[in-house]
Amino acid sequence: MGVALRDILTDLKRPAETDELKGVAAIDAFNALYQFLSIIRQPDGTPLMDDSGRITSHLSGIFFRTANFLTQGIRPVFIFDGKSPEMKGRTIQERRDVREESKEKWDQAKKEGDLAGAFRYAMSSTAIDAYILSSARQLIQLMGLPVVDAPSEGEAQGAYMVLKGDADYVVSQDYDTLLFGTPVLVRNLTISGKRRLHGRQITVQPERIVLSDVLSTLDITREQLIEIAILTGTDFNPGIRGIGAKTGLKKIKSGEFDSIIREKLPDFDPEPVRSFFLNPPVTDSYTLDPGRIDRDGIRAFLCGEHGFSQDRVDPVLDKISKKEKQKTLESWF
């Protein structure tokens, strides 16, 4: 997912302070769901499921993680992708192929008793289908949280909402959110905490990247950042072998973009990709007014339909309700 800009952004990421996270968070819903589905699994990689065999890992992630957001003063808005641009067809097919191959390797690792390998391949086999999307949306709305339907890429819509002043930052793992122009990108918010990586426990912290700091430190424009991404590869075009982010930065600053494209990718027109990042389809058709949490509806959905323990769900609902009452009292002063 996203673009390979990490090597030139490593020194520009910093831990996000608690106060910096308060406010409206425009969450890339597909990205968050993918993280929940990838990580919330049993030791052999099997996702959480209800008695009917329906996956519930994403519901667990949405409910418990979002409840934590609300108690910290974070107001989540979930943005769902719309129609993918035709340019993304290659990437979508490649991801489908990776999932199918990973599924086969996951099954084999389980047969061999290789739990570490099974978990790793299971993560790579993660897929988001119609059930995942509809059940996620239902729970989000039962929690009284706004849902925005993007006409195309969710990160682009989130960036637009931050630029417009309707949100404070975009939450996504994908660096291409910066290419869409978001002033602030927060990574790791949906997966922060202790996580298992390559067989060992690590602590993942939310990190904050400010676009203006990136551009000023690297001494480039947003258009040049997009050109670096095009050279290294995006969801909409393959990269050039041998050119990573650091090399791409050098090439762009020396004015070599056009000549490299002509030499290495003579049949590729970068303009549609550049234009999509600069002027993506977005919409003003949304409302961010929060609704009230439907406690009975959540119990019926999580505990009744999907087998969640009411002993785990009720304390979380109480915590959210307490925060809601506190906010109501504060609004009088």
Swiss-Prot record:
Residues 325-333 are annotated as: Interaction with PCNA. It comes from the Archaea. Residues 117-255 are annotated as: I-domain. Binds 2 magnesium ions per subunit. They probably participate in the reaction catalyzed by the enzyme. May bind an additional third magnesium ion after substrate binding. SUPFAM superfamilies: 5' to 3' exonuclease, C-terminal subdomain, PIN domain-like. Mg(2+) 2 binds at D174, D176, D235. GO terms for biological process: DNA repair; DNA replication, removal of RNA primer. The keyword NADP does not apply. Its EC number is 3.1.-.-. Residues 1-99 are annotated as: N-domain. Mg(2+) 1 binds at D28, D81, E153, E155. One of its GO terms (molecular function) is DNA binding. InterPro entries: 5-3_exonuclease_C_sf, Flap_endonuc, Flap_endonuc_arc, HhH2, PIN-like_dom_sf, XPG-I_dom, XPG/Rad2, XPG_CS. Keywords: DNA damage, DNA repair, DNA replication, Endonuclease, Exonuclease, Hydrolase, Magnesium, Metal-binding, Nuclease. Its cofactor is Mg(2+). Structure-specific nuclease with 5'-flap endonuclease and 5'-3' exonuclease activities involved in DNA replication and repair. During DNA replication, cleaves the 5'-overhanging flap structure that is generated by displacement synthesis when DNA polymerase encounters the 5'-end of a downstream Okazaki fragment. Binds the unpaired 3'-DNA end and kinks the DNA to facilitate 5' cleavage specificity. Cleaves one nucleotide into the double-stranded DNA from the junction in flap DNA, leaving a nick for ligation. Also involved in the base excision repair (BER) pathway. Belongs to the XPG/RAD2 endonuclease family. FEN1 subfamily. HAMAP family: Fen (MF_00614). Interacts with PCNA. PCNA stimulates the nuclease activity without altering cleavage specificity. This is Flap endonuclease 1. It comes from Methanospirillum hungatei JF-1 (strain ATCC 27890 / DSM 864 / NBRC 100397 / JF-1). The gene is fen.
